Design a protein with these regions (language model features):
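A beta-strand edge to alpha-helix "cap/lid" segment located at domain peripheries
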Residues: 56-129
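A solvent-exposed, acidic/Ser-Thr-rich amphipathic alpha-helical stretch
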Residues: 20, 25-76
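Hydrophobic pocket/interface hotspot
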Residues: 7, 22-24, 31, 47, ...
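A short, structure-level motif marking secondary-structure boundaries and short turns
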Residues: 4-5, 40, 87
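Short acidic-aromatic low-complexity motifs
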Residues: 1-30
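Generic anion/oxyanion-binding catalytic loop in active/binding sites
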Residues: 12, 40-41, 113
């Protein structure tokens, strides 16, 4: 698979579980995963277990239908950028949001070594209030 195909596989599976399995298949053990400053889950997490605990589990338990809708991808050598839109409804407040987002993935030898998120976090934070 190409780097672009690997990254696409983490978004475009038939189910969230399939996307998660694809992510687990292609990440290095010590992946560096950065959620943007100002985002509710901001920080850098090392290793898929930490990412799952601090990001994915929270997204699944705190939001209704939280998702990333890819608009397009740009690939160059060892980097792939996916950009599009986040949507979801915060369970506690019942408020929905839409936010533009870009994800920068870095790969080495067909393995994902890092992920960095850039997002308009204001609309996400507004849904929390």
């Amino acid at each position: 698979m190409t780097n672009l195909e690997i990254v696409k596989s983490t978004y475009e599976g038939k189910t969230s579980e399939e996307n998660g399995r694809n992510l687990a298949k292609y990440v290095v053990e010590d992946i560096s995963w950065t959620e943007a400053k100002g985002f509710p889950y901001a920080g850098t997490y090392i290793g898929l277990e930490n990412v799952t605990q601090n990001v994915f589990n929270r997204l699944g338990s705190e939001w209704i239908d939280y998702k990333f809708i890819p608009e397009d991808y740009v690939a160059s050598d060892d980097k792939v950028v996916a950009y599009g839109t986040y949507t979801g409804t915060y369970k506690i407040t019942g408020k929905s949001f839409t936010a533009r987002v870009a994800h920068i993935w870095k790969l080495k030898d067909s393995k994902i070594i890092s992920f960095e998120q850039f997002v308009d976090s204001q609309t996400v934070n507004d849904a929390l209030k």
